[in-house]
Amino acid sequence: NADAQIATGSNNSSRYFDYYFKDIPHIIRRNRSSVAIISGDESRDELLELGKDIFTYFGLGCRSVTKVYIPEDYDITVLLEALEDFKELSNHNKYANNIDYQRSVYLMNRVVFLDNVASLFRENSEISSPVGVVFYEKYSELNVVREELVKRKEDIQCIVTNEKGFYDSVLPGQAQSPELWDYADGID
């Protein structure tokens, strides 16, 4: 018998944990990812810092950025070219296999995507992307993005941005370096 339980798993397994541990105090961790918001005014150095937030630990983990919001008129090649500095990741066999697999699936299904060797970029409204893929979504107003992220708060670990007014936000390059008091899911 235990006084409390802590469990981690997928969104699906968390449903079972919630049921199984319903009568005792518990903390259940679910799938989460991090997102970034680009204003279009970022320097190359800031984009490289964002690259650390995307590619550190091969994009695995709740603090890894799996989705980037970009302005409607943003030239995404600026981001892609900056992130080419991480192309050495494609020399890692298992990471490269993920990119090759996703590229094959996208080509066979005629899905539009961009490729900068380090990763594939696909326009998609989902938060979590497969390993080797970064989703992006265009926005016209930051307030709309802000509202969307509040609605999806349960799916988001942190937000990487220079913009003000976003909950749990960190500057580019800081997603993988939480403070001691940055509790996962906000639970101590």
Task: Please tell me what each predicted stretch does.
Residues 9, 40, 51, 59-61, ...:
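Residue-identity detector for glycine
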Residues 2-15:
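Active-site phosphate-binding strand-loop segment of PLP-dependent enzymes
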